[in-house]
Amino acid sequence: MNNKISNYLNKAKEIILIVLSFLLPCLLMLFLFKIENIYPFGDKTIMMIDMQSQYISYMRYYKSVLEGNKSMIYTLSKVFGGDFMSIFTYYLASPFNLLIVFFSYDEIPAFFLFTNLLKMSLAGLNMYLLIRLQKEKGNFIDLIFSIGYGLISYSVIYLSNFMWLDGVMILPLVILGIDKMTKKENNIIYPLALGYSLLSSWYIGAMICIFAVFYFIYKYISLDKKFKDRNYFILRFFVFSLIGGLISSCMWVTAFLHLSGTKASFSLPQPIFYNFVMILAGFGQNNYKSVNDICTNYGYMSMFTSIISLIFFQLYFFNKNYSIKERIASFVLFIIYLFFSSFSITYTLLHGGREPTWFPCRYAFIIGFMVCYFGSKETDHLSKTNIFGPILPLITGISSYFILKNLPIEMPSEEKLNYEISMMSLIIYFVVIFLLVCYFIFIRFKPKYNKYVKYALTFIFIPLTCISSFNGARNVLQVNDKQYQNIETYKKDETYLSSVEKIKSLEKEENYRMEMLFNRPGNYNDIDNNPMFYSYNGLSHFSSSENKQIEDYMLKLGFHYNGYFEKYDAGSTASINSFLNIKYLIDNTNNYTNNKPKFINKYPYQELTNNDNDGLKYYTNSLTLPLGFASDIMPYEWFQDNERNGNSMKYYNHFEYQNSIYKSLCGNILNENNEKKDIFYKIQPLSISLSEGVIEELDEAGHKYYTGKKNSTVKIKYLVPQEAYNFNLYFAEMNNNDKLNYVMDYNYLENSYWHKGIKGIKDSNSHVHELTMTFKEDLNHEIINESFYYEDTNILKEYVNEINLQGVNDLVIKKGITSFSYEGSFNLNKNNQQMFFTLPYEKGINIYIDGKKVHTYRTGHIFTGANLENISYGNHKVKITYQDKGLILGIGFSFIGLVGFGFSIVYYNKLENLIFDSKKRKHK
């Protein structure tokens, strides 16, 4: 009877511990969100920085995919179109994101909060399971590390980088799996956990894989000399790592094959050492003092897991229950990560071979994990700690206090904030050390009371851990308070969705692109991801997975691109809008900026009837080309003869480039001299005046070079010719040189990191315009190619009407599991034609004419073309299909991985024994 009661109580205790390991981090964070007024408990959301500008847009688009409105494989809601899986695998692959179907669009901020809360709570639970499943029974003292890891400062700081928290959550199970394989107890946990880490985020998963290798080496070194299964362990680690990698191949293989040409390319920095003291400060409660800490690429990391776990971590190295070899191996593993974090080359390698842009040390949770994991080993055998063990944390605490209280006077005040001492943490730190010293002394003389004293300490330490972790998390939320987006701002963003839906109601989305001439209020850093936020076919976009060649081409066409994000901005020209099938524009007249297109007020644009009273206006372009059409066969790239200097670009002219696009597409729009007509014509200067000391030089091609001091000016007057009076005027500095300020008729023409590209100019009554270029710094033989052009929309109309005769009509979208297609029809009426789609060419794209596959290739620099040489005149069916070959390959590998996993469950141990037993027999 007593045994039954004892078993019942033990089971009840185990259940309580499991529940508490999940519930305590959950309740602490819920209470914190409540008192800090985080939505849905208040008016602030956890959205900040990239979540504002990127992730919220991707999540909204993903929701539309799950609702069946958009394709998972291909999207036209970024730049000129392209695969969606590169975005999905990097940002959205977590299975938790499927829960978005239970939230409305206006509840997505709450979705982010609750899924992050769930991941953090599961991180606490998984840490407890890691500790518990390596011994006979669980103890309440284990909750110290469950709470500490669940509320690790890394997770709270990076709440807005929601896709990284899956890695924090799953890491304890990866390590549990390795430990279980060591003992030949379980081969299932490791491959599933490793596979999940790579599936949910291949980026963070890769960091976990690197740590798994280091941990395997640590574990191997730590094995007792009498351990007979070393070779078994090596084979198991290799085989089940392979299986875990294969299971998740559908994500990381797909991502890898899409990475070529993106920002994810391999690039090592110059070898330098970072501030090591700043890195050590990451273990402190108050280490996060400014959003600027994470708006840097290196030198900062945060891995605070409560002040108490840090004490036990230090004591672990004095615990006699563990061999000296194991403790040294643990210490080396920990130091390796600290050293790697302080040296630029190894730091970059741990990030996959490319230094992160903002959000430094993205693997810092691994270091916090080690603090909790090795600290938990200490509490398992607390009584075996050397009585002098507390000296180390005592010295650490005292020396840290005096060092931080006497920081160099010359240290910047902002940097000093990161070393600010938390008095509460300091008190808890020394109280815990004092209690532990008392404990070690007491059990030395009264060992039989060890169990009861340890229980008493446990129920002191758990509340102190809650206080310490809670304060650390609260510090982060309070620092981020002004950065967090207000829910009302998000709701304001949501109101513009109805405007997009009005355009969509006019005709099928397949037939056009559209853009918004203003950014939603909730964007960050002027980044524009409106096409994905509102799920329309548009150009503006920013993600880390976009192809660099396509981004560069945005700038080439006269749009904005600064090396990071691309956007419609001032809209380039009416001709390029027509070329790219941009048929509709939405403007907010309450949002005034000079970085808006001027061509909307002239032909071929006209304002649609609008009954709104919210300042919104809708415009339609009557001269748009369809998404696909038959055209003259053209070269891979469009260049003018004077643009080349050997193999490099010397001089580039947006307007002449746009002329060449249309002349290449259609060769029968001719002038009286039987020459192809231009759409753009240069307006020649009336006069040029240089301020004192400015030197102007011309090279053999007529390109201008300037030398002069800062604040010097060059003034150029233009007279618009009479034939251009009713046409659009444009200005561009062809090299996008941001070393000068440009002012046209007292209007600032911004050419900066935030706004580049072609700018529209409003004509004056006098038709005289003055450009003033002011040097922002000293210039020495700097090439400046300013150009002032007008656009003859009558000639544009000729080109568009002629090309439209062979346009693809009645487009229909077909969505498959791994494919996406446009289907339509066109009428071929010329010889020597190609099919041309303003969709970027990439592997997996094919064009079919009347059901037959034709040779498909890259044309027009980045676009997709197919030869129509053997196609007869008349009506034809056309289909352009994108098949994600990376996804197909990844799914194939995942299937192999799942089969291998199933096979290993049944047969692995038998095969392993067979292999090693046969070797033993041969050896004998």
Stretches with model-predicted labels:
Residues 1-38, 232, 236, 451-461, ...:
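Start-transfer (signal-anchor) and selected internal transmembrane alpha helices
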Residues 3, 10, 58, 673-924:
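Active-site-proximal, structured, solvent-exposed surfaces of multi-pass membrane proteins
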Residues 22-25, 117-134, 139-222, 233-261, ...:
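Membrane-embedded helix bundles of polyisoprenyl
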Residues 25-127, 147-168, 207, 252, ...:
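Membrane-interface coil-to-helix junctions
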Residues 30-38, 96, 102-106, 140-161, ...:
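Membrane-interface helix-loop junctions at the exits of transmembrane helices
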Residues 78, 463-487, 504-579, 625, ...:
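Extracytoplasmic/lumenal acceptor-recognition loop(s) of multi-pass membrane glycoenzymes
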Residues 93-94, 276-319, 360-371, 422-436, ...:
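Alpha-helical transmembrane segments at the extracellular/periplasmic loop-to-helix junctions
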Residues 185, 204, 328-347, 354-492, ...:
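Contiguous transmembrane helix-bundle modules in multi-pass membrane proteins
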